[in-house]
Amino acid sequence: MLKGGENMTTQIKKGFTLIELLIVIAILGTLAVVVLLALDPVQQLARTRDSGRYSSVTQLGHAIEAYATGNNGVYPTASTTWIDTLVAAGEITVAPGAIAYNVTGTAACGATNVQNGWCYAFTAGTGAIVFARLESKANINKCAAGQAAWVVYSTAAGRGGGVCTANATTYPTAGLTTFTF
């Protein structure tokens, strides 16, 4: 007999059984996998990098316009050191870092006027553009299948935006005034 007149068969057990604990762990594990798949950390990082590209392309575009304003409408020469020209002129204090393209199939533009992955095109009388390839699915899906998504700053339009081109080797052109997204 136990104290208080209880016998061993009526004693209440406190705590969880091993089976109950395993079921809870399995449910939590399943929820964790579902949440991880929904968040897709690779695409989260790609969207973050794309946001940085939007910002940098816009800043470079404004610097090009300021350079042209201070140089009687003449834009920087199209070369592999076009950003250094903006730094030397005092339009920006430091060249933006190189673009990190981490998603398979995404690469810098093939133009010859590329510095640190930032692309530049200039046509006399038409204006200049700064552009970079976008990599997140959220931006790529704004274009039709097989097309490439770019962030572009156009001096002809006086602003930046997203542009779709026929494919990854078709680049935006200077004088662009219409944006896809």
List the predicted regions and their residue ranges.
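Aliphatic-rich helix starts adjacent to a transmembrane/signal segment
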Residues: 38-58
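N-terminal single-pass transmembrane signal-anchor helix
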Residues: 9-39
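Short, surface-exposed interaction loops/tails
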Residues: 126-181
